[in-house]
């Protein structure tokens, strides 16, 4: 009986040694194994955290780029951004001096390239250099459609360059195995640096009133810069957006003159809106041009005030959950202080 016991014991010892040997292989494969008389249990080993994703941003100091940088840093990205002027350093944000026309390859491999500046300049840079980032997100403009048939030749050229830049970007990205998305904002506001609503607020604040044509009843969809920055981040998680362009308007559609009225209402004190017959307004505009003023308000812009510039946001809502805010500006969004307007 003792011989049988010793034989069984020896067999058990050999079996346990064999188990230890084989389980050691499992441990080397990435599992820590507890060797006790109780059943062995495999516990995943602790690996170092994954390296942070790296983004390259052009136009990072602009009105859309700034909130985009905040969003990237908050999400744990390492960001490399270019600017033509020296910018203050921040944790996780690396600034580089330079302009697109003279830049060479990115300083290191990146996961995504964002362009928040002129699309044609970015497309030229992307074409000039063999950049191999798996993801590209660039801002264009709905001017591609709005100014296609403009009365002004310069505006038609803007639309042409936007159209060609989009085509170049999509073609190059596809050839390089990258996924590109183009976002086309409508009328941008929110940082006090736009050339339309903030300019209206500044002019009205100086005079205490603003003159507009009664015919300025075309519909608009003003969009906040924060909503645009969030859209740029949201498309990264949606493969449906690859190779697509999206119009990005605001969450409210309103008449041009109602939009202007809301802008004037945030001033302290509120500025008055003076509505004139179209012919009278056009004459005053011509006189202003003769005096070298209001050059940005040309005949084509006056015509567009009467047109509905409304875009379908359904594709953006469907593909990446785009949900822009309604138009509710305040003084800070328009770049004006809360002090009293200067009456002239």
Language model features with spans:
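Conserved SDR Rossmann-fold cofactor-binding beta-strand/turn motif
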Residues: 184-185, 189
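Mid/C-terminal beta-alpha module of Rossmann-like enzyme folds, strongest
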Residues: 235-297, 313, 318-344
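Alpha-helical membrane-targeting segments
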Residues: 199-225, 270-309
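NAD(P)H-binding glycine-rich loop region in Rossmannoid oxidoreductase-like domains
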Residues: 93-134, 138, 142-153
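Substrate-positioning beta->alpha
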Residues: 194-199, 214-236, 243-247
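N-terminal Rossmann NAD(P)H-binding glycine-rich loop of SDR-like oxidoreductase domains
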Residues: 56-73
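N-terminal Rossmann-fold cofactor-binding loop
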Residues: 82-86
């Amino acid at each position: 009986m003792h011989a049988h016991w010793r034989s069984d014991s020896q067999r058990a010892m050999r079996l346990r040694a064999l188990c230890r040997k084989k389980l050691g292989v499992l441990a080397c494969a990435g599992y820590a194994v507890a060797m006790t008389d109780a059943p062995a249990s495999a516990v995943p080993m602790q690996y170092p955290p994954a390296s942070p994703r790296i983004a390259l941003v052009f136009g990072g100091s602009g009105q859309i780029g700034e909130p985009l940088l905040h969003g990237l840093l908050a999400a744990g990205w390492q960001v490399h951004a270019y600017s033509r002027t020296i910018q203050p350093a921040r944790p996780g944000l690396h600034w580089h001096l330079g302009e697109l026309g003279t830049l060479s390859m990115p300083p290191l491999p990146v996961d995504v390239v964002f362009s928040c500046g002129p699309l044609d300049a970015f497309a030229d840079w992307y074409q000039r250099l063999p950049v191999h980032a798996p993801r590209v997100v660039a801002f264009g403009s709905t001017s591609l459609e709005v100014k296609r048939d403009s009365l002004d030749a310069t505006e038609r050229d803007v639309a042409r360059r936007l159209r060609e830049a989009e085509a170049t970007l999509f073609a190059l990205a596809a050839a390089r195995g990258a996924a590109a998305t183009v976002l086309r904002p409508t009328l941008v506001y929110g940082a006090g640096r736009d050339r339309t609503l903030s300019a209206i607020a500044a002019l009205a604040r100086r005079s205490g009133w603003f003159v507009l044509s009664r015919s300025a009843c075309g519909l608009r969809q003003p969009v906040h810069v924060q909503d645009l920055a969030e859209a740029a981040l949201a498309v990264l998680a949606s493969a449906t957006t690859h190779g697509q362009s999206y119009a990005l308007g605001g969450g409210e559609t309103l008449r041009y003159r109602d939009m202007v009225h809301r802008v004037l209402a945030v001033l302290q004190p509120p500025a008055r809106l003076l509505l004139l017959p179209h012919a009278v307004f056009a004459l005053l505009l011509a006189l202003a041009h003769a005096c070298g003023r209001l050059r940005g308000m040309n005949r084509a812009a006056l015509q567009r005030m009467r047109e509905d510039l409304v875009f379908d946001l359904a594709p953006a809502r469907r593909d990446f959950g785009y949900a822009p805010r309604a138009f509710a500006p305040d003084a800070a969004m328009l770049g004006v202080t809360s002090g009293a307007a200067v009456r002239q």
